[in-house]
Amino acid sequence: MEVVAYYRVSTKGQGESGLGLEAQREYIKFAAEQHGWVVVAEFEDVGVSGGIHPLERPAGAKAFADGHPVVVAKLDRLSRDVEHIAGLMKRHEFRVATMPTADAFQLHIYAVLAEQERRFISERTKAAL
């Protein structure tokens, strides 16, 4: 199956270091090898919050407009918002490299956890100021 890879990091620093992006590439590469996926294009958003809808991000919009299923390393790289994930599940095909066989129920549960983590990150950031 031909797929496109989508990578996202929240800060410019993560993008400049390459560490977050490289880890995502490795997850997707491994999953592609295991499941016979062929990555035909790659899209990358750097310095973009997981709270922004994927279709409103420069590279995210292009990835989903490509027409191939989109693969992300982890669900929180796609979004940290339950509504975003639920909407994408209805309209687009995507896979998560770290849980390629996850069903709709499991994806919803992980989306709730990702959204909760976004709130925790925000609280920790505010407390540190």
Regions found by a protein language model. Name each.
Residues M1-A128:
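Short, structured surface patches at the beginning of a domain
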